[in-house]
Amino acid sequence: SNIPDQALTGSILISNNEIKLQSSLLFDMADLLESTDYFSMNGLEKFDAIVNISNEVVSLKLNTNLNNTVIKSSLDELKKDLNIKLATKIFISDLSNPTYLIENKKFKAFIGERNNGFFSLGASFDKEIMEINNNDGFHIFLSLNKFKIDDLFSNNDFNNTSNLKSMTISINQLDIF
């Protein structure tokens, strides 16, 4: 994705070989990720941004409450309505070689080089996430209350996901038909 042109206001703090820039950025959430049958976002969202320059590395922290964003999904646990706050943090440790750590109360995701990493919905897979190799593909962990097979396997999206390494699902109620 691309960061659109922004009108920036904020502050600059310089101390001991470190430069910290603080500002706000506005994003059209629909432009950040391609919509799929499983996930889409819509809304104009403001992020508090901190750019940190230290030891020749530029990192970026973004924080928002996603109040102006609607998240649609075939998975009920991932959906979010407009005007519902969901504090979300995004951290990019090195803008010259970006990886993305995204965290909120609903999910946690790490997207590394070549789109390797993980997506975890719910909090029941912390141990398994610590044991995976983030460089060998993309791992999906889903903790769901109720699950219909049709919700996830309704088309060939996963056949086209060449780096999908594993999918682990914990389900309270499974509806096969």
Where do the model's predicted regions map?
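Membrane-proximal interfacial segments on either side of biological membranes
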Residues: 1-105, 111-177
